[in-house]
UniProtKB/Swiss-Prot annotation:
Protein function: Catalyzes the ATP-dependent transfer of a sulfur to tRNA to produce 4-thiouridine in position 8 of tRNAs, which functions as a near-UV photosensor. Also catalyzes the transfer of sulfur to the sulfur carrier protein ThiS, forming ThiS-thiocarboxylate. This is a step in the synthesis of thiazole, in the thiamine biosynthesis pathway. The sulfur is donated as persulfide by IscS.
First-listed, main subcellular location of the protein, grouped into a coarse class: cytoplasm
Biological process (GO), any one: tRNA 4-thiouridine biosynthesis
EC numbers on record: 2.8.1.4
Protein name: Probable tRNA sulfurtransferase
Family from the record: Belongs to the ThiI family.
Sample GO molecular function, one term: tRNA-uracil-4 sulfurtransferase activity
UniProt-annotated binding residues for ATP: 181-182, 206-207, 263, 285, 294
């Protein structure tokens, strides 16, 4: 029996009205890129993508990480007649394990005789008559759900055991671009993932403080960028030398304002690279109140030097929720490796938690801001994943 991979869109794509075709086209393009190297045939049928391939397992593994895909399933392709549909449904039930079942039918082909409820009832009766072991119907919480779709050329049958959940969201690249300030911690990779899930193209900037931070710390961030790139088409990682900026701040500025001034330089560098690379926004992994620099006042002061939108998708999330997502997207184990990043050195004993914009601006007059930012960007390294 022929088998295809059914790719279901995330439900949100159906709500895009006149723009739906653009989202569908981008999703198909992204699927094609994700399955590069695998011989496939696309079949598009009214809100469904079917994929024909001999490499089903590898294809499903890749498809489950495509933003805009809610789920994928291996389906049996059967002729449009009740006998074939019934037999395939029974085979699917035998393959699965459970004591209760339900049949759900979608009669997309309105020329097919009967309605969806009657068809499901007939298939269920056939299963009960022909299944050897004890089996009961449960329409609310069945162990096995047999799905039947009857379309114009074929019918498709699969069970809930054949389904692999996707990441959903919107097709990658549909909603502009952002520069993620990527550290080696838990939060920023999750922030980047959530932005990419909303269709935002991801670029990353990492601030490296050699020799105070080791090459292992840099390697950790590179590994995090690779993991994020497994969900996207590609990622540019900009590695910015940050030691000279930090030393200048340490030498000339008040100790209790070191952290917030450092954060402002990070923001300036991210915005400047974004400007030069045509990137529309900046993204940070900050969460309100999580550390001393992430108070409301601290975030306001950080934003003061930004020349484009700054997104903080974790802003109201608890640390435990962030950690759960990190585990799910497989960045957690890398993030907790014990290598310090530039944010963990030169930390004042008593950082200011309620900085004022006018006070910080006055303190920054001691520094040659434009020269420090320009030199750091001129010496940065660009790595593509």
């Amino acid at each position: 029996m022929e088998k295809l991979i059914l790719v279901k869109y995330a439900p949100e794509i159906f709500l895009k009205g006149l723009n739906r075709n653009k989202f569908e086209k981008r999703l198909r393009d992204n699927i094609g890129k994700k399955l590069e190297g695998i011989k496939i045939e696309f079949i598009h049928d009214s809100g469904r993508y079917f994929i024909k391939t001999n490499e089903i397992n590898e294809s499903i593994k890749r498809l489950s990480n495509v933003f805009g895909v809610s789920e994928v399933a291996v389906v049996d392709v059967v002729e449009i007649d009740m006998d074939s549909i019934k037999k395939s449904s029974l085979e699917k039930l035998i393959e699965a394990e459970g004591k209760t079942f339900k049949v759900s039918t979608n009669r997309a082909n309105k020329n097919f005789e009967g309605n969806s409820t009657d068809i499901s009832r007939d298939i269920g009766a056939y299963i009960l008559s022909n299944y050897n072991d004890e089996m009961n119907v449960d329409v609310k919480t069945p162990d096995i759900l047999i799905n039947v779709e009857i379309r114009n050329k074929n019918a498709y049958v699969w069970s809930n055991k054949d389904i692999t959940k996707g990441v959903a969201g919107l097709p990658y690249g549909m909603n502009g671009s952002t520069m993620l300030m990527l550290s080696g911690g838990i939060d920023s990779p999750v922030a980047g993932y959530l932005m990419a899930k909303r269709g935002v193209e991801l670029n990353c900037v990492y601030y490296h403080s050699h020799p105070y931070t080791s090459e292992r710390a840099k390697d950790k961030v590179k590994d995090l960028a690779k993991i994020l790139a497994s969900y996207t088409e590609k990622i540019n990682l900009y590695v910015v030398p940050f030691t000279e900026i930090q030393m200048a701040i340490l030498d000339k500025c008040r100790e209790d304002e070191l952290t917030i001034i450092m954060r402002r330089f990070m923001m300036r560098v991210a915005c400047k690279i974004a400007e030069e690379k045509g990137i529309q926004s900046v993204t940070s992994g900050e969460s309100i109140g999580q550390v001393a620099s992430q108070t409301m006042e601290g975030l306001i002061v950080s934003n003061d030097c930004a020349d484009r939108p700054v997104f903080r998708p974790l802003i109201a999330m608890d640390k435990t929720d962030i950690m759960d997502i990190a585990r799910k997207i497989e960045t957690y184990e890398t993030s907790i490796l014990p290598y310090e990043d530039c944010c963990t050195i030169f930390v004042p004993k008593h950082p200011k938690t309620k900085p004022r914009v006018d006070s910080i601006r006055e303190e920054e007059k001691k520094l040659n801001i434009d020269e420090l930012v320009r030199k750091a960007i001129d010496e940065m390294e660009n790595i593509v994943y």
